[in-house]
Amino acid sequence: VKKQEGKTEDYTWLNRFGNMGTFLKNDIKLIRRNKRSRTTVIISALFLLYGLFFFTGSVEMYETPVMWVFAGIFVSGGFLFTFGQYVPSWDSSYYPLMMSQNIQYREYLNSKWYLIVIATIVSTLLSVFYLYFGWHAYLAIVVGAIYNVGVNSYLVLWGGAYIKTPIDLTSNKKAFGDSQAFNVKTLLLTIPKLLLPLLVFWLGNWIWNETAGYLMVALAGVAGFAFREPVFRLIEKIYKKEKYKTLSAYREKAA
């Protein structure tokens, strides 16, 4: 039995993706083996229940289509917000070693992006029970997922370049958030993550109707996906620029 478990742990099926597959294997092992990362995944799963505040009519101020879009962003993006925004801090313990091996930032970032996208899709599928509260509830979640994949997935990786706080994988301390991980740049990136989709929906709803609002938010996500290559080049450039500051911060905290 132990031999079979060890073989399963190898995730050899990811080898077909080259170096990116290696990064994905490392992330999966990190999540499975460490207390902090497992707790983060559990917290991200709890985001699936966040929509109950918005779609059940329990809170009157949330009974508006704009707030439904807000809920959709969070329900589908639990992993994106709890895990994604702390890239590359998850790898802080061996980040200097990785950098000494001259890894390709594109492959590293791609692996994180795919992990976020897969988690977003899984969250969206698991939230299908919201159809019980009406088609508008699940539509808001699907639209939120499209925006998360096409826009927010880039923004969390972008913001991660400015976070210089290492993560202790053996401890659940600050598992619900670390104030040191926020700065002016990361806070500014919060605007397009949370407020821009609400503004886009509001404009579509105001000019035309609710359906147009949902469509415009979804199109914003599709447009972001279409510009994936230039956006990744920009993010890669930022990571390279911040490389030595990040390494210095991790080494300083480890000392």
Q: Where are the predicted features?
A:
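Short helix-to-coil transition segments within interhelical loops
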Residues: 99-104
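A glycine- and small/hydrophobic-rich beta-loop-beta segment
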Residues: 95
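Hydrophobic alpha-helical transmembrane segments of membrane proteins
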Residues: 1-91, 105-255
